[in-house]
Each structure stands twice: as C-alpha cells, then as structure tokens.
Amino acid sequence: MNVLLTPQPTPFPHQYETSRLSPQRSLSPYTNMTSRKRKADDNEGDEMSVSPLSSPAIPSRHLSRPSKKIRAAEASGRPLPLPRLLETLDTTQLRTVLQKICERHPDIGQEVVNGAPRPSVGSALGILRDYQQRLRGAIPYGQTSSDYTYYRVKQPLMALVDAISDFTPQFLPPIETQVTASLQYLDGATKVVHELPDWDSQAYRQHKDNAYDEISRAWALVITEASKRGGGFVLHTGGWDQMLAKHNQQSGGRLGSAMQAMASNGWIGNNSPNNQNASASSSSGSGAGGDPNSILNQLVNGTYGNPVRVGPW
C-alpha cells in the first residue's frame, strides 16, 4: 500500500537555501545610530506640530527697558539746613540768636514771653549762683589795691546785681501767688547778697547797699501779703521769722523794712536779739503784740475763729 507522505522541513536548513534567509542588514554602527536619531527627530517634530486644545496660552512678557542712569549733581558748597544749624549751637549761642530776633521783631518776643514756662525758684537761684561764680573767678589773687580789685570785678559784679534786680519781681505778688515760693527765693537771693564784696569806699559799697535795700522791701511785701492769708501763720510755722532775723543780723541791720513788717504783723522769733524792742512793747500792752484782739493772741489763746457775740446777752 503506497502512502504518500508530505515532506517535512528539516529543522536545520541547508546552508545553500538562500531563499529563507532574513534580509541583509548593515553592520555599520554609525549608520544604525543615524537612522534611529532621524526617526526620533521625526517623531518629536510631529508631536510639536500638533498643539493640544486645552494647553494654556503662555503670557507674553514685556521686557522692561533699563532706566537711564541719573547723573549725580556736581559737588558745590551750600549752607546747612535750619535743623542741622541749630544742632551746632550751644545754649549761649542759641540764646544770643533768639534774643536778637526778638529785639528785631517785638511781636515774636511777645510770643516767646507768653509761651515760655515760668522760671522756677531753683532755676532762678541757679542762674544767680552762676553769676556769683563768675564774680569769684574775676577776683585777683594776692594783695591788690581796692581800686584795682573793683575795676577787675566791676563787670561781673554789675551783672550779678542786675540779675537779682530782674529776678526778684518775678517772685513777688501778684505775679507769684504762692507765699512759700516767694520766701524760698528771697532766702536764697539774700544769701547771694551777703557774699557780695565789701569795699572800704562808699562809692563801691553802693551796689551791695542797694541790693540789701531792694531785698528788704521785697521781704516786707511778701510778709504783708502772707499776713492776709490765715493770719500769717505760715511765717511762724515755717520758721521764716527766725530766718529773717538771722539774715538781718548777718547784714548788719540793713533789712530794717522787712523786720518792721514782721513785727507789725505779730510774728517774730523770740530767740533773735533784734526783737527785744518788739517783745518789750508786747509785754507793756503797746503795739500789735499787746492787742488782745490781734490774730497772734487769738491763735495763742485758742480763740481764733470763734463766733462774735452780738446783742445785749
């Protein structure tokens, strides 16, 4: 029985069977890499050519032009601004400039007077002490004649005396309403007057004598005004009567007006040697101290402020 079998291909092809071989490829690596790169470039070009519809639009940026360089001003001299100029002035220079402006423009001077705070007792006495230090610094060393010394210290001496004359009315009523402030200033100013130079010549002593006279009248005015407030009780409780008696003794009795004002109001220190006449007149029933209705006796007896009887009962 003849059976026809289909011929089966051999698992190992013959080397001469060229029809079944794969196409021949280039063995050059350079050619292979070039073809691959070209394909990649073609794919990228296709992707970039197709823009998605949902892609956001890139905003266009405006490039700012570089600003022109500002040309620096050439160096030249110019005066200082007013705030810088005032920083360079000390107290004396600033006071001099302000004083000249006020003298040239009286309306500005009046505004300064109205706007400036009132001087305190401490500031006024501090200025007097500054003038006093200048006077001491002008006194020559060693033994010198009286005339030479006087003319050497005349200018600071006059400046101190004038300062006392200018400051004293500022602390007197009705400008100064506080009696204690007035008394404190007069106490300090009197101490300054005590230390003024003593001269042998009467012509040179007139400055100190005039200063004592002015201070004495100022004491009298303040004492009289204080006696109208509470019977002048502040004069005794503050020890001002004894203080005035010591000043009068140190001045050589040149505060007579002040002592008379203190005695006439019934307030004077009992330990002072300058009140012996006043004490004697009080014990004899004469003067203000001997009056039973005086404020001093009423305060001592405890009857000050009691109601006064009116009528026959």
UniProtKB/Swiss-Prot annotation:
Keywords: Cytoplasm, Nucleus, Protein transport, Transport. It is found in: Cytoplasm; Nucleus. One of its GO terms (cellular component) is nuclear membrane. Residues 1-76, 264-301 are annotated as: Disordered. GO terms for molecular function: polyubiquitin modification-dependent protein binding; proteasome binding; protein-membrane adaptor activity. Residues 269-285 have a biased composition (Low complexity). Residues 16-34 have a biased composition (Polar residues). GO terms for biological process: anaphase-promoting complex-dependent catabolic process; chromosome segregation; DNA damage response; metaphase/anaphase transition of mitotic cell cycle; mitotic spindle organization; nuclear protein quality control by the ubiquitin-proteasome system; proteasome localization; proteasome-mediated ubiquitin-dependent protein catabolic process. The keyword Ligase does not apply. It holds the Pfam family Cut8. Involved in ubiquitin-mediated protein degradation. Regulatory factor in the ubiquitin/proteasome pathway that controls the turnover of proteasome substrates. Targets proteasomes to the nucleus and facilitates the degradation of nuclear proteins. Belongs to the cut8/STS1 family. Binds the proteasome. This is Tethering factor for nuclear proteasome STS1. It comes from Pyricularia oryzae (strain 70-15 / ATCC MYA-4617 / FGSC 8958). The lineage of its organism: Eukaryota, Fungi, Dikarya, Ascomycota, Pezizomycotina.
